[in-house]
Swiss-Prot record:
Topology class, membrane: Peripheral membrane protein
Residues with Phosphotyrosine modification: 1047-1048
Keyword Repeat: yes
GO terms for cellular component: cytoplasmic side of plasma membrane; cytoskeleton; cytosol; endomembrane system
Gene name per UniProt: hop
Subunit structure, interactors included: Forms a complex with Hsp83 and piwi; probably Hop mediates the interaction between piwi and Hsp83.
Protein name: Tyrosine-protein kinase hopscotch
Pfam families, sorted: PK_Tyr_Ser-Thr, SH2_1
SUPFAM superfamilies: Protein kinase-like (PK-like) (SSF56112), SH2 domain (SSF55550)
Biological processes, Gene Ontology terms: blastoderm segmentation; border follicle cell migration; cell differentiation; cell surface receptor signaling pathway via JAK-STAT; compound eye development; compound eye morphogenesis; compound eye photoreceptor cell differentiation; cytokine-mediated signaling pathway
Bilayer-crossing regions: none
Stored PANTHER family: TYROSINE-PROTEIN KINASE HOPSCOTCH
Phosphoserine found at: 40, 321
Biased composition (Polar residues): 16-41
Amino acid sequence: MALANGGEDRMDDSSSGRTSLADSASLTNSSLRSGTSSQSIHTNDGTIRVFNFTTGEFERFHPNMLCEEICNTMCRQLGIAPIAQLLYGIREHSTSRRPSPLVRLDLTWCLPGERLNCQLVYCFRMRFRVPELDSQLELIDGRSHKFLYRQMRYDMRTEQIPEIRYPEHKDKSTGLAVMDMLIDDQEQSEDQQAMRSIEKLYKLYLPPSLWRAHSFFVGSKIREVFRSLKANSLSVERLKWHYVHQVSHLAPTYMTEQFTCTVQYLPNEEVARGSGPIGTSLAHSTSTLASSGSTNTLSTLTTNTNSVALGGSGKKAKRRSTSGGIDVYVRVFPHDSLEPGLKVARVTSEATLKWILVGAVEGIFMISKINDTSVRLEIVGLPKGYEMQFQTEKEMKSFISYLGIYIRLSSKWMQDLCHSYRTPSLEELSSLHCHGPIGGAYSLMKLHENGDKCGSYIVRECDREYNIYYIDINTKIMAKKTDQERCKTETFRIVRKDSQWKLSYNNGEHVLNSLHEVAHIIQADSPDRYRIPASKYDKPPLLLLLLPKNLKAKKTDLQLSEAELQRRNPQIFNPRTDLQWYPDSISLSDDGMMFTMRGDWIQQSPVKDVSVTMKMLKSDGNFMEFFRLAQTWSLIQSPQFLKLYGLTLADPYTMVMEYSRYGPLNKFLHSMPNVTLHCLLDLMHGLVRGMHYLEDNKIIHNYIRCSNLYVTKYDPNSYVLDAKISDPGYPRPYRESDSPWIPVKYYRNLQAAKTDQFAQLWAFATTIYEIFSRCKEDLSTLRQEQLLRQKNLDGNILKMLDQDICPAPIFETIMDGWSDDETKRFSHHDIFSRLNTIKAEILPNYMPPPEIATNGTGDETVIDRSDIPFLPFPRSNMLMVIPLTSECRVIYNMENMIGRGHYGTVYKGHLEFNDKDQPREQVAIKMLNTMQVSTDFHREIGIMRTLSHPNIVKFKYWAEKSHCIIMEYLQSGSFDIYLRFTAPNLNNPRLVSFALDIANGMKYLSDMGLIHRDLAARNILVDHNGDGDCVKISDFGLAQFANSDGYYYAKSKRDIPIRWYSPEAISTCRFSSYSDVWSYGVTLFEMFSRGEEPNLVPIQTSQEDFLNRLQSGERLNRPASCPDFIYDLMQLCWHATPRSRPSFATIVDIITREVATKVTHPTDGHQSPPNQPTDAE
């Protein structure tokens, strides 16, 4: 039966393989406008009719087919990749031009497991908008980008995009129509061009309302512009790209769905006139302009919320009265918006809606069906869930399908959100214990995470073809009984036909009845098989299409006030989601048991993140002592002390403190000797208030001194200098260096001073002395003998200060603090009186401060990275921040490690720019494991900064303090993994094109006089570009520039990859471009063996054995299915005499000549993206 393929009445254009655009225009603008078509769409012939935007016709399907089956068939027919299938859906089709503004438009979507109604007509549409639509969609799936153009064109002509409607956007609509005409003109065959002129059919490309209003004027203008652009037009592919680009930017809510329902309450709603908020916080409430009719809006009320729906099949619920509920709009704000999540807004006729966050999308873990029109959402943070009542059953189903698929495409691809409406394909994958199209690299990671046992396997769907599966199975144990022992993973192709599985294995095909049989027929070193099933917690990057590749930075000038931060009670932080860490700022505190680091407290609401200082307990510290410190500090409620915002209760145990922009006071004053007297008096005023707070609350601090006061504000123009008292730190004994801050009577028993509440008044006096002496002298270097000698001279432990820098009343206060009579040491009344007297007597005399460096954690000695681990806690999954320049910083998660080598580890992260209009950019961060190879690090930076070639990985930034290099991120990952896991789908033409990529990149390096010294598949990355792939050379850690003779002589023998090295490089450490050519030959072996290890046969027993056999003439065997000319090229690369090997320029010529200059990437059913001409913009 031909129903599933659209029947045999399709109009096929022999030259283009589709109905011509002009014919489609005629169909959509005349037949559909009147509610009919050439196929009599309202005639019920017992089939399901689905409109196809690509052909402009209705496809017919058997009525027993489920919605998901029809979607699958349409995707196959249109060449849409399996990974993109969930972006599409089936919706009821509008055959009217434009509904009356008083009529409720009800175009609902079908659930995947639902059967469609023969009485209705439907359309196949892209439903979900991927982030950065105009650029990312083409990279995900080129065919989807082409389909979107057809869909947008149809929606423009039928005026279904509210944001680009006449009359507001007359010029934009006209411009898009001209672009449409240019595309259609280029896609016509010569015969079609002879039969009709696109220029004369211009009215078919215009929205009808525009044509009716301006038919007299617009015709001549469009024809004139069309003729002008046609003479120098871009290619069809670039025109389509610009069309999609224009529409996506003019209509930012295109493919955004908005629902209407009734709820019982609005969480976090701000109630007017001081009646308080409903819910817990106002932080999630935000205002935004509502587009009253967003594209493809579902169940959106325009003016009358009780209007009757068109095509109103489906059960209806009586709309509750206002007293029984609240009518709201519901919308999912996507992950690339500033405040993503599920939001609601009261239905109102006002132009501005108040959108209120119900919950993060990833926090919605279930939808329960209450009845035919009502659901309850189970959401993290809402203990009793959140009920929604829709007007019809169809609306409810549309909402369930939208939210369920959105969550699959953003967080949990293997999960059905509503168990009342199951997805058939998910149930089948679950019953087969099979993964979706997760890709080979993610499969390898899963095998590693699950122990990497021999016999472990994963079965996954192919991400390029339908009905094709792969099995990734660990078959061999390599390097047994050594510290390098690991499993070899092999990948085999499986074709599914009905209920049977056809396995390609050992040069034959085996037809089997189950995947269990498939796993057991493949030979492995272990008889056992361990199947690794899919999990709802899997996060394969290939499938999470709605997660933005480049997140937008939080664009806001709003920030929490100091008063608001002071009011908040300390909280428990999740170190993974609430905090960002700056590992470059790490330092060891004076107590020796805690590390200090700068950080950011991430704010979920639309305000700036809060800068914080984090104090982390060392792994050998006592948690109870840490907890007692945090408990004491959490009770302090005074602005004179650094605020404790909260703490983490997971390793590393951390106190999250108020941030000090200028660091400790002693360092600040030492670097700012000209701080004026007024500023110092202002500073002292705050310190006196802090001491009074300690006295009133009977708190013994024990560490009052300038090094423990942190400067938070300095504004000489306003005469402000604020410093706050920090916590005393981890308990530790007093040392002799603490003597200036301890009463002399305790010099023989320093520890006894810790229980004396008057002892900190002595410390207060010494601290005032430090302040007014501008910390010129480090008092901690003074010995007790010196202090006692000075006290015997004039009664004070330190010399008197000159009255020019310290007024007499201030030094009188200092002497009171050093008095042996404890009752005279501190009187805040007397001190405030003295301060006021001094301020009244002197005039403000401020000098402009010199520029100073800011350091959030102070200037404590930064520890050499070789003395401690990279971080003072085990590998974790916290967000790390490294400042790069004044313009940007890099943020990464240690959990996102994507590679590890001898000298470094590579993480995935993103660049965040200070310019909030510039989106975040995904990058790879290569971080050295040890500082002992810092010379290599600087050399690698110096080399990478000079390189610019399409087959060389792009260098972006570097951070010397962190010893890390920031490079472009290539999602397809390492070439050696790609070879193994894409092996069944890798044909020789594709491999030859990769060989040419590498040769071109190496020719560029060779021309620059650069020797790579580590060329291998593991150091090559794969770049997925649209529907094609190319490769780029990376890892220049061993690279060197050659001398005038073309050689580089290594000075030391370190761990070297001998199986890729030429004999002269192994034996004499002499490297040249010719030794790179040898490595290129070995890399060719890796490629055409589909990822095999380059071992001699029989395998070498040692490095010496390997070298001896190479020198005796042995070479790697020819890989199976390797073309003759490629193995001949390998043999040339492995010539014993270096200068007899071909140069890379010669290699490029050999490959190009062999394939007659027509080496292209195979399409596997997909077309490569177009090349943009230089004059395209």
